[in-house]
Regions:
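Catalytic-core region of carbohydrate-active enzymes that cleave or remodel glycosidic bonds
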Residues: 111-180
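Aromatic-lined carbohydrate-binding surfaces of glycoside hydrolases
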Residues: 1-93, 98-106, 178-180
Length: 181
């Protein structure tokens, strides 16, 4: 907070690409890995315990209201299973997603960032604004234009802010800003 991080902190890694989770095993004094996926008992047990503890910690520090459990570009079925685990741990957790638009899970997402080229239905965007939910768009390595690659015309970066304003969105996200083709 003292360094200006006071609006939102996104906490990732519930659904990593490899679905492999590293932990420290005190009994063997070594690092171990567990492979488990949303919908599996081990996944739920592990994450409910962690998120319950994390929720308590965030509340003690006064950070809970600015933290969101975040995911990116996962299939809707995976996100639905993950949302159930998050809600079981603490129904008040905010959830953030950068990915495709899915009407089925949209109401559960505090911060929803969809890929450029997709649109929020106007009534959804207006409702989200009334509910003080963040509604954004993003670009990543998929689309060559517009973007912010080293080969991109600088005007593209300026255009993206105008696009966000024209669509009445809360902002723009350059996903994986350090990942270039």
């Amino acid at each position: 907070m003292s360094v200006g991080i006071d609006k939102q902190i996104n906490c990732y890694s519930m659904v990593p690409w490899e679905l492999s989770f590293q932990y420290y095993d005190q009994a063997t004094n070594s690092l171990k890995f567990v492979k488990t996926a949303p919908g599996e008992e081990a996944y739920e047990e592990m994450w409910v315990a962690m998120l319950s503890s994390f929720s308590k910690h965030l509340k003690e520090k006064g950070w809970f209201d600015i933290c969101a459990i975040a995911m990116d570009e996962r299939p809707m079925e995976v996100m639905q299973k993950t949302l159930k685990v998050i809600r079981k741990a603490d129904p008040d957790f905010k959830v953030s997603l950068a990915g495709n638009y899915h009407a089925e899970i949209e109401p559960d997402l505090y911060d929803y960032c969809i890929v450029i080229g997709q649109n929020f239905p106007e009534e959804v965007r207006l409702r989200r604004a009334a509910e003080n939910k963040r509604t954004n768009y993003y670009t990543c390595c998929t689309e060559a234009h517009p973007n912010t690659f080293t080969f991109s015309d600088p005007a593209e970066a300026a255009w993206m802010s105008y696009y966000s304003s024209k669509k009445h969105l809360d902002g723009y996200l350059r996903w994986a800003y350090n990942s270039w083709p």
